[in-house]
């Protein structure tokens, strides 16, 4: 079984069964890698990795993962490619389609990724945009499933800025029947269009996706507490102002105590300790942050294999 669409731009585009398929294949690939079993399903394939944003986890996990699948990744930053000098996205898409077998892009504008996929004849994977971060959110589902076995009916609370991470988590939760609350200050809540789409998805899986300003009210009964940086790339000038606004939304021992006793803590990294999360919590026994980071490798391998391999895994 493969994915219905040739691209992975948003979790909203995935069918419920496709999310389960990605998680299942990720588990198989993780076992194979841990057991030293060969799994070079993309031998002879080439992946172009386009980066407009700095990266540690995205670049490393995609590059290493594609090597482990037997393929050859090529890294192209804006300053090392013509797209960074103003070449139309549609031209880049059509040229790369004649050279490589897939494209992963990490950039600012989501519209650019949509345009890239429109004109490319090969799979395009959204490695992150200002609107969405689907590979991370699928990784988060995989991590929660590893720790808690069952996803449906769980309660996840995202605390902080209603950013690209919050958006993709809402889509992800809705697809698997997880209840999700976004605890965000007024003026920093998720995009209303994304919220409406996630709530529509949730209506088919019997869960709820809501937004709440009162963070203590939001976290009651939470199985998962999740946060992200308060100022994303491109928002550095807002950092000081955001620190004051988001101060009540820090994940600390007091907030964690309001969740379920067995709740886990997640962060997509990089973490700014003492701001959105305290050092004692991220280093504490309920933190799964570094397991979560590792799982980017396994989930993205599953995504690449499902999009770029003709045969059934």
Model-found features: residue ranges?
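Phosphate-coordination loops involved in phosphoryl transfer and adenosine-cofactor binding
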Residues: 42-47, 152-154, 262
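Generic N-terminal amphipathic, Lys/Arg-enriched alpha-helix
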Residues: 1-14
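Rossmann-like adenosine-cofactor binding region
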Residues: 199-279
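Short, structured coil segments at secondary-structure junctions
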Residues: 69, 99, 119-120, 176, ...
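Adenosine-phosphate binding glycine-rich loop
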Residues: 262-263, 268-313
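Phosphate/diphosphate ligand-binding glycine-rich loop within oxidoreductases
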Residues: 34-36, 40-145, 273
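Glycine-rich phosphate/diphosphate-binding loop of Rossmann-like nucleotide-binding domains
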Residues: 52-64, 148-227
């Amino acid at each position: 079984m493969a994915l219905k669409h040739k691209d992975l731009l948003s979790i909203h585009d995935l069918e419920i069964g496709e999310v389960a398929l990605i998680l299942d294949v990720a588990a198989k690939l993780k076992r194979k890698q841990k057991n030293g079993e060969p799994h070079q399903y993309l031998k002879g394939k080439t992946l172009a990795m386009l980066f407009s944003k700095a990266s540690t986890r995205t670049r490393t996990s995609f590059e290493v993962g594609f090597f482990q699948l037997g393929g050859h990744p090529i890294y192209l930053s804006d300053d090392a490619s013509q797209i960074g000098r103003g070449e139309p996205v549609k031209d880049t898409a059509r040229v790369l389609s004649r050279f490589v077998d897939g494209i992963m892009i990490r950039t600012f504008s989501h519209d650019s990724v949509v345009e890239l996929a429109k004109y490319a004849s090969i799979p395009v994977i959204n490695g992150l945009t200002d609107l969405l971060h689907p590979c991370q959110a699928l990784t988060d589902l995989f991590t929660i499933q590893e720790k808690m076995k069952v996803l449906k009916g769980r309660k996840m609370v995202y605390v902080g800025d209603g950013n690209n991470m919050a958006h993709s988590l809402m889509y992800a939760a809705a697809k698997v029947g997880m209840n999700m609350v976004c605890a965000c200050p007024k003026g920093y809540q998720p995009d209303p269009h994304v919220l409406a789409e996630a709530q529509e998805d949730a209506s088919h899986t019997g869960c709820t996706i809501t937004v709440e300003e009162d963070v203590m009210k939001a976290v009651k009964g939470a199985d998962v507490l999740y946060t992200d940086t308060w100022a994303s790339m491109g928002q550095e000038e807002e950092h000081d102002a955001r620190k004051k606004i988001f101060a009540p939304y820090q994940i600390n021992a007091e907030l964690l105590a309001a969740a379920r006793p067995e709740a886990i803590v997640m962060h997509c990294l990089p973490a700014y300790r003492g701001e959105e999360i305290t050092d004692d919590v991220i280093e504490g026994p309920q933190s799964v942050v570094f397991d979560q980071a590792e799982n980017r490798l396994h989930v993205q391998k599953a995504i690449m294999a499902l999009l770029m391999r003709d045969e059934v895994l």
